[in-house]
């Protein structure tokens, strides 16, 4: 009978498991892996519980799948500053696309535009001085201290030894306080022997 320690040994020992190394090689070509999250695996009488630490990761940035008997948890841990900048850029793009639809001015708007251009020419000299001051006071993001890890993360768990015992239709996932919990119930009849009837 396979113990939990056997499963973890198989996972960590690349030389003894061709499926694991093949999977690792195949997926690491596409993206560089910056973070390998910590994982706890518990096998009880009725279920398999996998807990993965993903502090600071949004649940929308996590991808979970099972391929060739290997559970793959992957995604990206983004800096909060970058997230905010991306959201602002998306909002600006939406606003710009909405403004382009309403680009043609009415007669009143055209007359106001002509007046504003003449006023603008008068104030050009004053604004050039203000622009130079604005350049010096612009906010520049500098990292004073950066100790946290960011980037792509990926973690594998080889389930080939116990996959026949698991009911994959019962997979339940929860993500709370930076902890991803995957629960897979065991089948009622988990024997790997199949009875074949003769016709």
From Swiss-Prot:
Keywords attached to this entry: Stress response
Domain sHSP: 30-199
Similarity-based family: Belongs to the small heat shock protein (HSP20) family.
PANTHER family recorded: HEAT SHOCK PROTEIN DDB_G0288861-RELATED
Cleavable signal peptide: none
Presence of keyword Repressor: no
PROSITE patterns in the record: SHSP
Organism: Dictyostelium discoideum (Social amoeba)
Record Gene3D superfamilies: 2.60.40.790
Pfam families linked: HSP20
Location of region: Disordered: 83-105
Claim: Cytoplasm is one of the keywords in the record: no
Name the record gives this protein: Small heat shock protein hspG4
Source domain of life: Eukaryota
